[in-house]
């Protein structure tokens, strides 16, 4: 992949569009799989319930060397490897009821939602001293060893993050004055729980 460049001071002139200054040993590989199912059911003419369930599985594997560039186009870069695996499950359910009190039409909605994430990660850096190159005259360098700063095992990343969000909401959409005025009143409570884990244990 053509990498992102970080300027070190003044921004250098853009290299030729047909020039690829990335290293031949860099790559990025990502796969995302999504799925969702949703259903609704009319209990009566005025009451409807719904439920939805979704899931995502993501896998990412990268070997990168994004350069930092001086104004004259000279660069330094170091190798960065990472793997990531995400599993996400989300759910949403609720009930909606329409009714009238006096001259007011109500649409009352009660809903709940929850999302759970589990993430596995590992990384490895080569020496931050890096290697020199040039945006305008790039040359291939030998791939440095990514053994300077390591977190986890790239071939078998461990769980590093858990996150759970959940919420419940109640809303009443009130229609009055023959539909000329609509007011919505609502309350919502949300809970968030996050946990972080050591990359190596």
PLM regions and their residue ranges:
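Acidic/polar loop-and-plug regions of large Gram-negative outer-membrane beta-barrel proteins
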Residues: 1-42, 55-86, 131-156
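Tryptophan-centered motif/residue detector
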Residues: 24-25, 47-50, 106
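Signature of Gram-negative outer-membrane beta-barrel scaffolds
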Residues: 59, 105, 109-201
